[in-house]
């Protein structure tokens, strides 16, 4: 079974080919034009996707040594994401499927991150056992869910305001760091003191039902951003520069600690022994270290994709399409892109 995956939800134009579940190619073109603006400009993103999508798809097919006519399925991100950006890949994928008479599978971008722990490029030997608790954490999303064998996703908690990745980027911008600031903070924090300043961790209280205590599995990072802003406004520029690494480490500590703590609580409350951590922020070295230590201490099986599969990529789109096709979870239908897709079922579009 040969599947072409296409990803254009934000600022990466990516295409990948899976051959019988194995990654044969995964081409990613990152848009560098947004760095001068300190964030992604939607109109620029759409135009860059439109300019690059044909080139990237052709590169993926060539790298996999496969012809378009040999494809069995074509899949593309259908939301959520920047609506103009999503429409580029979605429209291209549908048109390609129609022209070839191949089935098209629209893929929920968040779901693709959740199942990115199943990406197989030949080097992975173990994959999450169902059911498992998944933490998906990126610039636009922070959520916990319970994942079942039929690919059903049961939400457990999510951010009530800002995503963890956004907290990294916005606090980094306050510090004068380049966009995206997450990787920069990660690097600077490695030589900083995480206890230099204690920034707040929100929604950590537990509620009592009868004789049982239940953790709040939602997240909030808007208060952290405000706290960092107030802290920095009270310091002299010389002080901030002298302690930049320590401040970065303290910010990273506040974000990563609450992510790990709530994921462990979610697994314990759900009664599962397997945890998966995905999304762009899962590439953070301190988050990985904390999860490895916590999983070992609590006896959980931990699965985190390689960094190249943590950020937006088409291999995860094709992988989820493969899992759906294996289970027969595709049906003929037309599909359009919503700006926010939530968890509604996304079906297959088949050329008639």
UniProtKB/Swiss-Prot annotation:
Protein purpose: Required for the formation of a threonylcarbamoyl group on adenosine at position 37 (t(6)A37) in tRNAs that read codons beginning with adenine. Is involved in the transfer of the threonylcarbamoyl moiety of threonylcarbamoyl-AMP (TC-AMP) to the N6 group of A37, together with TsaE and TsaB. TsaD likely plays a direct catalytic role in this reaction.
Catalytic activity: L-threonylcarbamoyladenylate + adenosine(37) in tRNA = N(6)-L-threonylcarbamoyladenosine(37) in tRNA + AMP + H(+)
Coiled coil: none
This protein's name: tRNA N6-adenosine threonylcarbamoyltransferase
Encoding gene, per UniProt annotation: tsaD
Main location: cytoplasm
Origin superkingdom: Bacteria
Keywords of the record: Acyltransferase, Cytoplasm, Iron, Metal-binding, Transferase, tRNA processing
Binding residue positions for substrate: 136-140, 169, 182, 186, 284
Binding annotation for Fe cation: 109, 113, 312
Organism of derivation: Chloroherpeton thalassium (strain ATCC 35110 / GB-78)
Cofactor: how and how many bound: Binds 1 Fe(2+) ion per subunit.
Known EC number: 2.3.1.234
């Amino acid at each position: 079974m040969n599947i072409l995956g296409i990803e254009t939800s934000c600022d990466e134009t990516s295409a990948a080919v899976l051959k019988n579940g194995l990654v044969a190619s995964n081409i990613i073109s990152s848009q560098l034009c947004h760095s001068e603006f300190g964030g992604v400009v939607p109109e620029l993103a759409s135009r860059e996707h439109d300019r690059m999508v044909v080139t990237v798809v052709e590169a993926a097919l060539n790298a996999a040594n496969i012809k378009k006519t040999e494809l069995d399925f074509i899949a593309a991100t259908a939301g959520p994401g920047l609506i103009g950006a999503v429409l580029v890949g979605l429209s291209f994928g549908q048109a390609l499927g129609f022209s070839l008479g191949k089935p098209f599978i629209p893929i929920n971008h968040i779901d693709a991150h959740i199942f990115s722990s199943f990406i197989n490029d030949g080097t992975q030997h173990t994959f999450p056992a169902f059911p498992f608790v998944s933490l998906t954490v990126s610039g636009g999303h922070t959520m916990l869910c319970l994942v079942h064998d039929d690919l059903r996703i049961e939400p457990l908690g999510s951010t009530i305001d800002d995503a963890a990745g956004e907290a990294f980027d916005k606090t980094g911008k306050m510090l004068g760091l380049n966009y995206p600031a997450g990787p920069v903070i990660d690097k600077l924090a490695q030589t900083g003191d995480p206890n230099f300043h204690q920034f707040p961790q929100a929604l950590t209280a537990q509620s009592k039902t009868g004789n049982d205590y239940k953790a709040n599995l939602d997240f909030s990072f808007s208060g952290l951003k405000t706290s960092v802003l107030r802290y920095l406004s009270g310091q002299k520029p010389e002080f901030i520069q002298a302690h930049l690494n320590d401040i970065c480490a303290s910010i990273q500590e506040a974000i990563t600690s609450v992510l790990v703590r709530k994921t462990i609580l979610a697994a314990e409350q759900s009664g599962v022994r397997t945890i998966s951590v995905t999304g762009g922020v899962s590439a953070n070295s301190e988050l990985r270290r904390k999860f490895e230590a916590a999983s070992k201490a609590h006896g959980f099986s931990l699965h985190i994709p390689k960094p190249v599969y943590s950020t937006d990529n088409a291999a995860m789109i094709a992988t989820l399409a493969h899992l759906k096709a294996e289970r027969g979870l595709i049906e003929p239908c037309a599909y359009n892109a919503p700006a926010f897709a939530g968890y509604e079922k996304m079906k297959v579009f088949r050329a008639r």
